[in-house]
């Protein structure tokens, strides 16, 4: 979904068995090197610049729960003060003031709540 003022980017990952995490909850297979084919690299500065460009994150409840486990393990909250919308019908604990929960139509969420407020929605 795109408007002249905002863009929604969907980023999904899954292993061949259809799950992101291992049975023990680890997602270490997602960790990759910062160098790629043809000698291209990602510098820490490039990554930081990219992450600062994201105005709002939208995630499912399982991804959110994984992020909370990282916090509990001492890794910190990966999203800083950037607003996070968690798609869920369950009662979950908010990790930060910037976290809100949503259960409803995604088109309504994007068009009525996110696009008026944010330009780069992930």
Regions found by a protein language model. Give the residues of each.
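Portal/gating segments that form or line small-molecule/metal binding sites
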Residues: 2-122
């Amino acid at each position: 979904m795109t408007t002249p003022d905002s863009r929604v980017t969907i980023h999904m990952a899954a292993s061949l068995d259809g799950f992101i995490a291992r049975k023990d909850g680890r997602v270490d297979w997602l960790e990759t090197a910062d160098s790629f084919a043809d000698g291209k690299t990602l510098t820490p500065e490039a990554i930081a610049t990219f992450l600062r460009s994201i105005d709002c994150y939208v995630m499912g409840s399982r991804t959110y729960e994984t992020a909370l486990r990282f916090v509990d393990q001492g890794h910190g909250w990966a999203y800083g003060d950037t607003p996070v919308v968690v798609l869920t019908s369950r009662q979950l604990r908010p990790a930060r003031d910037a976290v809100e929960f949503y259960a409803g139509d995604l088109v309504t969420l994007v068009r009525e709540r996110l696009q008026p407020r944010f330009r780069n929605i992930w």
